[in-house]
């Protein structure tokens, strides 16, 4: 395939970053169309990119004959309709999380995609493309720590937008640790419990922050996650896996630290997610572009991964209300080999 022509839908912070990324750092692709519900913003972005134009209707942007593939950086509430349009037009799509905003529509999207001859949807869980997470995954897969037993995670933000509520801490923040757990351990999550510590006095009124999430996988491994999104300090993400023959930690801005081997402590805390995971986003988009041009369409988290994360987070929101462990119920995974393609 020649240069991939990409439509970027939604040019807020994330979408504008993707436009700049594809334009300046990604090979084999260019942005041909942009769309945003704020028309003036889309027109401004388009004017800054050679050969790019703004299209008012997102569905028209997807259907545009000068678009080969789509990046969705629109609000999650719009994803279902836009993803279905991508499937209808057989256009590969990189969809920023969430896949959709509820379990039922996420499952329907996964099922609809499974009816096609090949996958089209990749979900933007960028940590899978982070150098440190990839090293940790390789360490676990290589068996150097023996059987992984427990994982400790920290997810801290300096602050959140004014519309953030307690459930969004689960759906927008914990969702990353949910995918990390499934990625590193290679198994599904069986239950989730959200514990409410004493709330931060600086948190917005009515927002329960911090929260502690306890995940249990189907094999019995436990993961604890500290979620604290109003620290007023910086963006801090840490992950430590404890295995039968040692432990490994990432996220200290000094590379992977092994407690069973000499290591160095120290470093600065990233001020935001763009600084912490900028390279991961670059790798994610480059690998997606390469996959689309090669005809495989995805090289990363699938629509099923998006659905599974939504199911865990739905159980998490239920636990946030009750304080009790809530089982995660997953549907049977669609099998493309047993479904007659559309």
Curated annotation (Swiss-Prot):
GO molecular function, one term: inositol 2-dehydrogenase (NAD+) activity
Alphabetic keyword roster: NAD, Oxidoreductase
Catalytic activity: myo-inositol + NAD(+) = scyllo-inosose + NADH + H(+)
InterPro entries with a match to the protein in the record: Gfo-Idh-MocA_inositol_DH (IPR050424), Gfo/Idh/MocA-like_OxRdtase_C (IPR004104), Gfo/Idh/MocA-like_OxRdtase_N (IPR000683), MI/DCI_dehydrogenase (IPR023794), NAD(P)-bd_dom_sf (IPR036291)
Domain of life where this protein originates: Bacteria
UniProt EC number: 1.1.1.18
Pfam families xref list: GFO_IDH_MocA, GFO_IDH_MocA_C
Record flagged with keyword ATP-binding: no
Gene Ontology BP annotations: inositol catabolic process
Enzyme class label: oxidoreductase
Subunit structure: Homotetramer.
PANTHER family: INOSITOL 2-DEHYDROGENASE, PTHR43593
Family indicated by similarity: Belongs to the Gfo/Idh/MocA family.
Function: Involved in the oxidation of myo-inositol (MI) to 2-keto-myo-inositol (2KMI or 2-inosose).
Name by which UniProt lists this protein: Inositol 2-dehydrogenase 2
Source organism: Mycolicibacterium vanbaalenii (strain DSM 7251 / JCM 13017 / BCRC 16820 / KCTC 9966 / NRRL B-24157 / PYR-1) (Mycobacterium vanbaalenii)
Taxonomic lineage: Bacteria, Bacillati, Actinomycetota, Actinomycetes, Mycobacteriales
